[in-house]
Amino acid sequence: MPPKAQKTPTTGGKAPAGKAPVEKKEAGKKTAAPSGEKKKRTKTRKETYSSYIYKVLKQVHPDTGISNRAMSILNSFVTTTHIFERVATEASKLAAYNKKSTISSREIQTSVRLILPGELAKHAVSEGTKAVTKYSSSTK
């Protein structure tokens, strides 16, 4: 196989002040892909809710911060337990029990009360009701 072309440092044609450009040494040669191009790894994107959690925190308590560990815990609560999926599934079951084909805010509210424990459910319901009221008033 033919060796790769030697790369030269790109500093915009200028060397840093007081230093001469240094040539890179060829330590370990790697072979190129058969097509002559390097294969790029696609970075898998992780879905996180960190920015949304932070925005809600700032709306509720503007002067309060959150540590990375606490953010990680809240993020895992939302993503790994699939809380949205659980609420939707429970709301679907409630609609089916009542022989209705539409999931309304009432089914969502009841499913949140069933899934989330105690005080957390109360806060979630009150914030959800507030959000629905705000949305309803803005669309008129």
From Swiss-Prot:
It comes from the Eukaryota. PROSITE patterns: HISTONE_H2B. One of its GO terms (molecular function) is structural constituent of chromatin. Residues 1-47 are annotated as: Disordered. Monoubiquitinated by BRE1 to form H2BK123ub1. H2BK123ub1 gives a specific tag for epigenetic transcriptional activation and is also prerequisite for H3K4me and H3K79me formation. H2BK123ub1 also modulates the formation of double-strand breaks during meiosis and is a prerequisite for DNA-damage checkpoint activation. SUPFAM superfamilies: Histone-fold. There is a cross-link at K7, K24, K25 (Glycyl lysine isopeptide (Lys-Gly) (interchain with G-Cter in SUMO)). It is found in: Nucleus; Chromosome. The modification N6-acetyllysine is found at K7, K14, K24. Keywords: Acetylation, Chromosome, DNA-binding, Isopeptide bond, Nucleosome core, Nucleus, Ubl conjugation. There is a cross-link at K134 (Glycyl lysine isopeptide (Lys-Gly) (interchain with G-Cter in ubiquitin)). InterPro entries: Histone-fold, Histone_H2A/H2B/H3, Histone_H2B, HISTONE_H2B_site. One of its GO terms (cellular component) is nucleus. The nucleosome is a histone octamer containing two molecules each of H2A, H2B, H3 and H4 assembled in one H3-H4 heterotetramer and two H2A-H2B heterodimers. The octamer wraps approximately 147 bp of DNA. Belongs to the histone H2B family. Core component of nucleosome. Nucleosomes wrap and compact DNA into chromatin, limiting DNA accessibility to the cellular machineries which require DNA as a template. Histones thereby play a central role in transcription regulation, DNA repair, DNA replication and chromosomal stability. DNA accessibility is regulated via a complex set of post-translational modifications of histones, also called histone code, and nucleosome remodeling. This is Histone H2B.
